[in-house]
Swiss-Prot record:
One of the components of the core complex of photosystem II (PSII). It binds chlorophyll and helps catalyze the primary light-induced photochemical processes of PSII. PSII is a light-driven water:plastoquinone oxidoreductase, using light energy to abstract electrons from H(2)O, generating O(2) and a proton gradient subsequently used for ATP formation. One of its GO terms (molecular function) is chlorophyll binding. The keyword Transmembrane applies. Binds multiple chlorophylls and provides some of the ligands for the Ca-4Mn-5O cluster of the oxygen-evolving complex. It may also provide a ligand for a Cl- that is required for oxygen evolution. PSII binds additional chlorophylls, carotenoids and specific lipids. It comes from Arabidopsis thaliana (Mouse-ear cress). Residues 1-14 form a propeptide. GO terms for biological process: photosynthetic electron transport in photosystem II. The modification Phosphothreonine is found at T15. The chain crosses the membrane at residues 69-93, 134-155, 178-200, 255-275, 291-312, 447-471. This is Photosystem II CP43 reaction center protein. [CaMn4O5] cluster binds at E367. Keywords: Acetylation, Chlorophyll, Chloroplast, Chromophore, Manganese, Membrane, Metal-binding, Phosphoprotein, Photosynthesis, Photosystem II, Plastid, Thylakoid, Transmembrane, Transmembrane helix. PSII is composed of 1 copy each of membrane proteins PsbA, PsbB, PsbC, PsbD, PsbE, PsbF, PsbH, PsbI, PsbJ, PsbK, PsbL, PsbM, PsbT, PsbX, PsbY, PsbZ, PsbC/Ycf12, at least 3 peripheral proteins of the oxygen-evolving complex and a large number of cofactors. It forms dimeric complexes. Interacts with PAM68. Interacts with HHL1. The lineage of its organism: Eukaryota, Viridiplantae, Streptophyta, Embryophyta, Tracheophyta. GO terms for cellular component: chloroplast; chloroplast stromal thylakoid; chloroplast thylakoid; chloroplast thylakoid membrane; photosystem II reaction center; plastid; plastoglobule; thylakoid.
Length: 473
């Protein structure tokens, strides 16, 4: 294979500690990196780097399968999933597996199958990872040029990008096919309190789908996180899958334009920084999605959202006091505003009290009581169904609160049930991971840009203090 440039220009930020750049070996002498620098030792060893990535995929899939089976083993069908600390079974239930009307679990066998399939897959990936890490060729360029690459080869890099985009597009279409043809998905908005249904009438209008992207991210608008019907979600996946697949084909067939060649840094560490930035954005969006959205993340499985629990409490006490004879339309609260109901600045009737800040909540148990101008007083007096009372009382006592101060008026009880909502776990973990990924992006982007500009910051290893100290042993 012909190398078009000197190895010195190829990746010199990684070799600041030594003069050698032999490709063999994975030790500090030959790579400039000690064992703890992980995959940095494999920058020029495409075969070994493949092994590291396949083994990592195996670990991920093994966790998914093992945790899945752990949750199945501990699952009690009589209790809601969100009371049992589950984070994987709610995802499977949302996809329509094993659940019936109202989100009731009627069959746990699909969950068991999912866990076993992931365990078997992880064994295959684990074997492949060990094979390529220990036995396979160190570099792929000579024997398998299709799988080989040189980090500076812009055309090859965009081809790899294209392949990744096609795989992402196929993944998006898997959800579409599940919703359309393979049993459907769970719809929390189905009449009577949620059910599994096939999505037949997809939203494919570009003005609707891309309208979400143009919305404000703030209250009442909520950007893409505000999506509240499955037709839009599945239709969005059709658009996303199509864009990814066609974009992937385009990147495979084309070479980067001159402006892209000039604007981007073309090195392994630069690609790492781009990937970390993308994952960071995904983490922050997922954090907001699981915290606020009760359509993609149905409250039957994940527990209520914070606003939902707060509004549920206001609703529960409105129901109670109305039965006791209170006139909920005119009762005044301690601040002079309505105790149970009030008007928003734009005139809609909303719940009063601290929960007024969550006036824009939409939830399947509440929407039937709304009219053209917000909550409908006559419906609140005549149309409240027992299932709505039960649902709101349940959600009121399962708020996703990990907060010391601002709890939206929800009554907190120090002797309450030991409960942490999956929404709290999932949103917090994705925020923290998204933040770490962002810091990693800044770090690696800075290093990659410094290397491309031809200067490096680092310790002068010839005069490092540790070199003059006595060895530990």
């Amino acid at each position: 294979m012909k190398t078009l440039y000197s190895l010195r220009r190829f990746y010199h930020v990684e070799t600041l500690f030594n003069g050698t750049l032999a490709l063999a070996g994975r030790d500090q002498e030959t790579t400039g990196f000690a064992w703890w620098a992980g995959n940095a030792r494999l920058i020029n060893l495409s075969g070994k780097l493949l092994g590291a990535h396949v083994a990592h995929a195996g670990l991920i899939v093994f966790w998914a399968g093992a945790m899945n089976l752990f949750e199945v083993a501990h699952f009690v069908p009589e209790k809601p999933m969100y009371e049992q600390g589950l984070i994987l079974l709610p995802h499977l239930a949302t996809l329509g597996w094993g659940v019936g009307p109202g989100g009731e679990v009627i069959d746990t066998f699909p969950y068991f199958v999912s866990g076993v399939l992931h365990l078997i897959s992880s064994a295959v990936l684990g074997f492949g990872g060990i094979y390529h890490a220990l036995l396979g060729p160190e570099t792929l360029e000579e024997s398998f040029p299709f799988f080989g690459y040189v980090w500076k080869d812009r055309n090859k890099m965009t081809t790899i990008l294209g392949i990744h985009l096609i795989l992402l597009g196929v993944g998006a279409f898997l959800l579409v096919f599940k919703a359309l043809y393979f049993g459907g998905v769970y719809d929390t908005w189905a009449p009577g309190g949620g059910d599994v249904r096939k999505i037949t009438n997809l939203t494919l209008s570009p003005s609707v789908i891309f309208g979400y992207l143009l919305k404000s991210p703030f209250g009442g608008e909520g950007w893409i996180v505000s999506v509240d019907d499955l037709e839009d979600i599945i239709g969005g996946h059709v658009w996303l899958g199509s864009i990814c697949i066609f974009g992937g084909i385009w990147h495979i067939l084309t070479k980067p334009f001159a402006w892209a060649r000039r604007a981007l840094v073309w090195s392994g560490e630069a690609y790492l920084s781009y990937s970390l930035a993308a994952l960071s954005v995904c983490g922050f969006i997922a954090c907001c999605f699981v915290w606020f959205n009760n359509t993609a993340y149905p409250s039957e499985f994940y527990g209520p959202t914070g606003p939902e629990a707060s509004q549920a409490q206001a609703f529960t006490f409105l129901v109670r006091d109305q039965r006791l004879g209170a006139n909920v339309g005119s009762a005044q609260g301690p601040t002079g505003l309505g105790k149970y109901l009030m008007r928003s600045p734009t005139g809609e009737v909303i719940f009063g009290g601290e929960t007024m800040r969550f006036w824009d909540l939409r939830a399947p148990w509440l929407e039937p009581l709304r009219g053209p101008n917000g909550l409908d007083l006559s419906r609140l007096k005549k149309d409240i169904q027992p299932w709505q009372e039960r649902r709101s009382a349940e959600y009121m006592t399962h708020a996703p609160l990990g907060s010391l101060n601002s709890v939206g008026g929800v009554a907190t009880e120090i002797n309450a049930v030991n409960y942490v909502s999956p929404r709290s776990w999932l949103s917090t973990s994705h925020f923290v991971l998204g933040f770490f990924l962002f810091v990693g992006h800044l770090w690696h982007a800075g290093r990659a840009r410094a290397a491309a500009a031809g200067f490096e910051k680092g310790i002068d290893r010839d005069f490092e203090p540790v070199l003059s100290m006595t060895p530990l042993n």
